[in-house]
Structure formats: structure tokens, C-alpha cells
From Swiss-Prot:
Record: active site: 191 (nucleophile), 218, 235
Compositional bias annotation for Low complexity: 334-343
Record-given protein name: Peptide-N(4)-(N-acetyl-beta-glucosaminyl)asparagine amidase
GO annotation, cellular component aspect: cytoplasm; cytosol; mitochondrion; nucleus; PNGase complex
Note: Present with 4850 molecules/cell in log phase SD medium.
Top-level taxon of the source organism: Eukaryota
Catalytic reaction list: Hydrolysis of an N(4)-(acetyl-beta-D-glucosaminyl)asparagine residue in which the glucosamine residue may be further glycosylated, to yield a (substituted) N-acetyl-beta-D-glucosaminylamine and a peptide containing an aspartate residue
Cited InterPro entries: Papain-like_cys_pep_sf (IPR038765), PNGase (IPR050883), Transglutaminase-like (IPR002931)
UniProt: substrate binding residues: 238
Native species: Saccharomyces cerevisiae (strain ATCC 204508 / S288c)
Outcome when changing residue 231 to A: Abolishes enzyme activity
Length: 363
């Protein structure tokens, strides 16, 4: 009997280690240099599909632009760090957490949302008159838009809105700047400016951040929470943390595509945010969009070492499971319940007319 036991005494630990090594090799092989057939498919796709061209173009900017150490230094010198960390420490201690817990970063992001919206940045439906001064925006009549002048062009300004003051008759320009460092100075804008600067702010604190673009003209952020071990929705316009349901449920917004852009990858995260009111997804075949995101992601990770690639791939797999399921049934029902009970249906930021035009007023 003892001899039989010896033969059947399988070393499961060794087998598990061997399988893990093989699995890791398999994962790494998926992120090695693209095969020629993949390159051909990618080139054909971006040459024949306008949506694919747009995703590629955005990735070339959004995946890298915020990783700028000199910008990070300027941001940290500009913000009131003493106030921010004082408030974080206060809330952290009040909830009974101990120093060193990795949930601290979640508290930091929540405070940055509060600080950015309530103390630092200003929503701008219409600008104040340059001649009459503060609190005069209601006197402004829009006259249309024009291109930037030489000075405005220095700060990546795409268009300039022109307004006339009904009181004094003077013209005021509202440049729509895309340079986040310039936005540190102007401290005003709409959702594009808010998300642009807030993404840089999160990056400046060393956080893993993604910029999320929605085809129906809204943008927001995600940051990877080490405590929750997943990507978390963050919207600075709404001071919203981990509320991915607010767009389709609270705002009643109709959406088709939501794409996340980060330094390590591009991901279609539509299923996280589009819980109802889904518009037709007819801009690109689903298998082509999946391939496109994976191809761009592979490019972004090409210079990483094997351990980094493997860790990110495991994180990807976990996220895909979450997206395929939508959310766990419990979490989803909690989200819908919380949204339906909210007394603040519809978007917070923006004028009533502007929100109604965009279909974001909850009606």
C-alpha cells in the first residue's frame, strides 16, 4: 500500500508552477511585436474607417500628453497642497483608517474632486465682460466663433467664442484652450477644459489615470484604485467618484461609444457606462474595434519588461470580465437604486438650455 501511495503522490505545487509559467509565456506572446498580418490589417483599417482614424489620432495624443514631469511640477506648485492633504487626513482619520492603508489614495482623489470643483476651477456658460468685470456673464450675447489669434494659438487653442456685452457694447473673446498649463491660469471652461486639466492633476499626484472619450460629446476620467483593485469612474464636472451610471440613468443621456485612453492601453469601456439608452454602434465592426484597441495597446507596451506586461495583462483580463458581466448584479442594482433615489436627476454643471440641447438634463 505504501508503494502505491508513493506512485500516486503527485507534486501539485510543481505542476501549478509549470502551468503558471506556460500561461505567462502565452500572455507575453500576445504582446510581442505584431505579426505582419496584424500590421496589414491595422493599416487597412485606419485607411478605410474614419472612426478608427479618430481613435488612433486621439491615442497618439491622449496616451502620452499627460506624462510630462515639468507639467506635474507646475501643477503641484499651483495647488494648495496643505489644504488638500489636511482635508484628506481629516476624512481618513474620521472614518477610522490607520496610516499606511492603500485606501488613502481614494480619499485623496475624492478631495481633489471637491477642491477642483468648489475651490479652484469655474464653469463657464458665457464669459464675464472684460470691461464690466465679474458677474456680468448674463449680459453677454454670443456672436459666433472664429479662429485663434497669434497669442491664443500658442496655447493649443482650436476655436474662440465671441461675445458682445449688452451693457457696454464691448467684445469679449473666450478662447477654448487645450493646453492644460494655460488652464491652470485661466481656471475656467466647460467639460473639455475640466477633464483636460483634472486628468493632468491626477497624473501629477502619481496616479494611474485614463481619459475617457464619449462620442456624444462628453469626457471624464478613470483612475486605477489599488484598494478597490479596479478602474474607478471620476468626473470633475460633477464631483463624481465611482458613479458610472450617472450618464445613462441620472442624465438619461443616449450614448454609443466610450473609449478610455491611458499610457498603457486603449480600451472600449462602453459597457461600464451605457446601462440604458444605447445608440446604434454602427461606426465600426465590433471585431475591428476590439482589434484596433488591442493593437494600439500592444504598441504602447512594447518597451515594457515581461513582468510589467504580464501584470497589466492580468489587470486587463479582470477588467474584461467586469465589462462582459456589466457589473455584478448586486453592484448594478445598487447603482440603479441610488440613481433613481437621487433628488438631483440630470447634470449639475452647465446652463439649463445647454444641458437640454445635449440631452443631459435627465428628461
Amino acid at each position: 500500500m505504501g508503494e502505491v501511495y508513493e506512485k500516486n503522490n503527485i507534486d501539485f505545487d510543481s505542476i501549478a508552477k509549470m502551468l503558471l509559467i506556460k500561461y505567462k509565456d502565452f500572455i507575453l506572446s500576445k504582446f510581442k511585436k505584431a505579426a505582419p498580418v496584424e500590421n496589414i490589417r491595422f493599416q487597412n483599417l485606419v485607411h478605410t474607417n474614419q472612426f478608427a482614424q479618430g481613435v488612433l489620432g486621439q491615442s497618439q495624443h491622449l496616451c502620452t500628453v499627460y506624462d510630462n514631469p515639468s507639467w506635474h511640477s507646475i501643477v503641484l506648485e499651483t495647488l494648495d497642497l496643505d489644504l488638500i492633504y489636511k482635508n484628506v487626513d481629516k476624512e481618513f482619520a474620521k472614518d477610522g483608517h490607520a496610516e499606511g492603508e492603500n485606501i488613502y489614495t481614494d480619499y485623496l482623489v475624492k478631495e481633489l474632486l471637491r477642491y477642483f470643483k468648489q475651490d479652484f476651477f469655474k464653469w463657464c456658460n458665457k464669459p464675464d465682460c472684460n470691461h464690466c468685470g465679474q458677474n456680468t456673464s448674463e449680459n453677454m450675447t454670443p456672436l459666433g466663433s472664429q479662429g485663434p489669434n497669434g497669442e491664443e494659438s500658442k496655447f493649443n487653442c482650436g476655436t474662440v467664442e465671441i461675445y458682445k456685452c449688452n451693457r457696454c457694447g464691448n467684445i469679449t473673446r473666450f478662447p477654448r484652450y487645450n493646453d492644460p498649463i494655460k488652464l491652470l491660469e485661466t481656471r475656467k471652461g466647460r467639460c473639455g477644459e475640466w477633464c483636460n486639466l483634472f486628468t493632468l492633476i491626477l497624473k501629477s499626484f502619481g496616479l494611474d489615470v485614463r481619459y475617457v472619450w464619449n462620442r456624444e460629446d462628453h469626457v471624464w476620467c478613470e483612475y486605477f484604485s489599488n484598494f478597490l483593485n479596479r478602474w474607478v469612474h471620476v468626473d470633475s464636472c460633477e464631483q463624481s467618484f465611482d458613479q458610472p451610471y450617472i450618464y445613462s440613468i441620472n442624465w438619461n443621456k443616449k450614448m454609443s461609444y466610450c473609449i478610455a485612453f491611458g499610457k498603457d492601453g486603449v480600451v472600449d469601456v462602453s459597457k461600464r457606462y451605457i446601462l440604458q439608452n444605447e445608440l446604434p454602434r454602427d461606426q465600426i465592426k465590433e471585431e475591428d474595434l476590439k482589434f484596433l484597441c488591442q493593437f494600439i495597446t500592444k504598441r504602447l507596451r512594447y518597451s515594457l519588461n515581461d513582468d510589467e506586461i504580464y501584470q497589466l495583462a492580468c489587470r486587463d483580463e479582470q477588467e474584461q470580465i467586469e465589462l462582459i458581466r456589466g457589473k455584478t448584479q448586486e453592484t448594478k442594482s445598487e447603482s440603479v437604486s441610488a440613481a433613481s433615489k437621487s433628488s438631483n436627476r440630470g447634470r449639475e454643471s452647465g446652463s439649463a438650455d445647454w444641458k437640454a440641447q445635449r440631452g443631459e438634463d435627465g428628461k
